[in-house]
Amino acid sequence: MAVSKVYARSVYDSRGNPTVEVELTTEKGVFRSIVPSGASTGVHEALEMRDGDKSKWMGKGVLHAVKNVNDVIAPAFVKANIDVKDQKAVDDFLISLDGTANKSKLGANAILGVSLAASRAAAAEKNVPLYKHLADLSKSKTSPYVLPVPFLNVLNGGSHAGGALALQEFMIAPTGAKTFAEALRIGSEVYHNLKSLTKKRYGASAGNVGDEGGVAPNIQTAEEALDLIVDAIKAAGHDGKIKIGLDCASSEFFKDGKYDLDFKNPNSDKSKWLTGPQLADLYHSLMKRYPIVSIEDPFAEDDWEAWSHFFKTAGIQIVADDLTVTNPKRIATAIEKKAADALLLKVNQIGTLSESIKAAQDSFAAGWGVMVSHRSGETEDTFIADLVVGLRTGQIKTGAPARSERLAKLNQLLRIEEELGDNAVFAGENFHHGDKL
């Protein structure tokens, strides 16, 4: 079915920054998509177009990207008469209209909004749920569907929070649950226990939450954060059912070839900065003490040697985010260098749905896992909930069980699990190989 109208407007994300919303009209109705944005962004990502006009929105306006949709993409797209069910044709058209390697002419935020809205229109035309359409596009198995383990970001540090803590995200993964609904209940109970423990130990304001809904107390070290989480798991009565994931976002504290765990202090002691192997030793010591099953971005985005050295001995899931930025060329290099064994999939890093699906397929083909991810600047759009089920990846990270822009995705997964009934399995301990279940 052809598109009769494409329209974009500027709306706001969960941090109060402007972002792009696209509406695409067919005979079936109006289909909408809102594009997210990240706080720690990789240098190899597709370009998110911002206006740069400091007199409005601190330079973060998206009026240029919106104008590109309304004045450039919309007339050309409607005229081209593309069938929305042919996602590859939709995305190839958008990519060629832009004509740059990193989508910098029209903006990845303009292109992605149209790409995702088209997939919603296609699902409606086929009279199927979005996850079913996405499964068709990715040629994924649908009997049964796989519901993901939620990696819930319950404690924030790094660029997402104040305090001296260098590592960015401490996540709980309820792998011992039998269903997604049970996993979310367990996660929620641990989160509430963590909140009250945090207030008790660090004062009432320590219960305030960061960008992704996790608590952000004034913690100095990773051990202190992990002890707090382990205590919360025990207090909630869920010992043994929950594993821990870390997102170190270490590109943020990589300076002059070393890692500065005191990077928020402008006068940090250079003699205490760590080499790649020293940081690897720190991770190994944490893995011995705590039930850690996944570490994301343990090293900086171009420190390939440190990644490959650590991966040989890690023995747990190592997730590439800043390293690969959902970019097929970077993924191929990471596979070849044996730097990691899981991809963090963020649709806005590459800028179209087709390229995102291809990135997941390339990763699966190499025996990697795939973790579908939100961004820190999120919206009420629930697309990634359907995507994780459609792609059958078995794992998702979309913040804490708090803040509506995070819960929007988790609640959508509850609905999908309920709708699928017996045709759904929960990934559980097999989260790394959801595609094989």
UniProtKB/Swiss-Prot annotation:
Catalytic activity: (2R)-2-phosphoglycerate = phosphoenolpyruvate + H2O
Textual note on the cofactor: Mg(2+) is required for catalysis and for stabilizing the dimer.
Molecular function as annotated in GO: magnesium ion binding; melatonin binding; phosphopyruvate hydratase activity
Chief place of localization: cytoplasm
Phosphoserine PTM positions: S119, S138, S188
Enzyme class: lyase
GO biological process, one term: regulation of vacuole fusion, non-autophagic
Matching Gene3D superfamilies: Enolase-like C-terminal domain, Enolase-like, N-terminal domain
Keywords, ordered alphabetically: Cytoplasm, Glycolysis, Isopeptide bond, Lyase, Magnesium, Metal-binding, Phosphoprotein, Ubl conjugation
Residues that bind Mg(2+): D247, E296, D321
Glycyl lysine isopeptide (Lys-Gly) (interchain with G-Cter in ubiquitin) crosslink site(s): K60, K243, K358
UniProt-annotated location(s): Cytoplasm
Cofactor: Mg(2+)
Pathway in which this enzyme or protein is active: Carbohydrate degradation; glycolysis; pyruvate from D-glyceraldehyde 3-phosphate: step 4/5
One GO CC term on file: cytoplasm
Residues carrying Phosphothreonine: T313, T324
Note: Present with 76700 molecules/cell in log phase SD medium.
NCBIfam families associated with the record: eno (TIGR01060)
Family: Belongs to the enolase family.
Protein name in the entry: Enolase 1
